[in-house]
């Protein structure tokens, strides 16, 4: 009797171990079969908007090593974006991130044709059964960076180079101003609009115009902060980055901090939704507390007590 029980127990244990391996390996195996497509309006090395999304995708790949990514940069909005998304679907993408505001309508059209593919759009105001919208709430982060700028400035003149006078950007500037005045009642913020999301010549001209007025801390809300950050550095002014931490290297002396989107955890969540069959169309909004944003490492010129105040 005992001779027959031993192999029986071993057999049962083997089956249990195999079952546990299947349970553990299941999600990883599913992730290995997932193709994710993402298209960018500009360069993935712009130190700003596009780089932040590209960094988020790379973080997702680290979290889910089996995921395959199809990534295309410098895709114009409109018909070109629609064509690129169609090609991604044909290549087997089951999740597509249309990473520009102007990609919304093309994404909706492609989503209607391929209901089995899930689409994600940042900042969109329309959804579809297979399209989710998402964004990060930034005024809190701008308020905190305003505090840093307000304590750093020596002229009490702060400046911002901004693409367009839309409500979302104006809310950020107002938050920055309130943060600055909370620690320095004499601080004031001046703004120049470029009228476009990417034009280095206009951005440099706007930055220089503000610096000529005595501004000594420059912030930026355009796709790539590199030009404004470099201009401030050349003129021995301080700078505040936006979108990505990538522009920090262009201002080793003047950089005081920045506000960066950290999309990695959210993109990982999206991928898991698709592989787990748990997708639902929704509008997602988070902020610093949700790890959708971070404040860049502070520059050496920022006093320790200011860092403690902002990070408390």
Regions found by a protein language model. Give the residues of each.
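N-terminal secretory signal peptides that target proteins for export/translocation
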Residues: 1-9
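A residue-level marker of the well-folded mature domains of exported/periplasmic proteins
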Residues: 31-312
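Short non-domain terminal segments
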Residues: 3-4, 17, 191
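Bacterial N-terminal signal peptides
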Residues: 11-25
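Signal peptide processing junction and immediate N-terminal pro/mature segment
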Residues: 26-30
